[in-house]
Design a protein with these regions (language model features):
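Short beta-strand scaffold positions
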Residues: 1, 76-77
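Conserved active-site segments centered on acidic
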Residues: 1-70, 140-145
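Short amphipathic alpha-helical surface micro-motifs
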Residues: 57, 80-84
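Phosphate-binding/catalytic loops
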Residues: 73, 83-145
Length: 145
């Protein structure tokens, strides 16, 4: 799960997916290093907590080339981060691991999960709802619980 700073969308996506399956290894990262080592945004922590998910112990980290070897699938939250991840890929196999997360629910639409960072508190509920729905699709696709 990859967004820009790894404090809003991707930690929330990680927490949601982890809450739905203990069989998946899920991590999150940011393409930028603004917040490396910091906790998720308090608004993400609070919206997750509202849904009985604890993401407070997560710490932001920057996406690296090693993630291509470590993970079978890499989900980008938006087109900009997708492009940044792809630019780090060394071959087609690595490129093929990267997908816009909302394409799992809305195939080939290339929709982005909006960044709620500069928005209002209710934007985080909207992001939670989007990510919760797409995480259900991911669980169905890979048939893991």
């Amino acid at each position: 799960m990859v967004c820009l700073g790894n404090i809003c969308r991707s930690p929330l996506a990680q927490g949601i997916l982890e809450s739905k399956s203990s069989k998946l290894i899920v991590e999150s990262a940011g393409t930028a290093k603004f917040h490396v080592g910091k906790s998720p945004d308090l608004r993400s922590i609070n919206i997750a907590k509202k849904h009985n998910i604890d993401i407070s112990k997560q710490r932001a980290r920057q996406f690296s080339n090693l993630d291509f070897q470590k993970f079978d699938k890499i989900y980008a939250m938006d087109n900009d981060n997708y492009s940044k991840i792809i630019s780090l890929a060394k071959d087609q196999d690595e490129i093929d691991k990267v997908e816009l997360i909302l394409n799992e629910e809305y195939p080939r639409t290339y929709k982005s999960v909006p960044d709620p960072y500069f928005g209002q508190k209710d934007g985080f509920q909207y992001i939670y709802d989007l990510l919760n729905s797409v995480c259900n699709k991911i669980i169905e696709k890979y048939e893991v619980r």
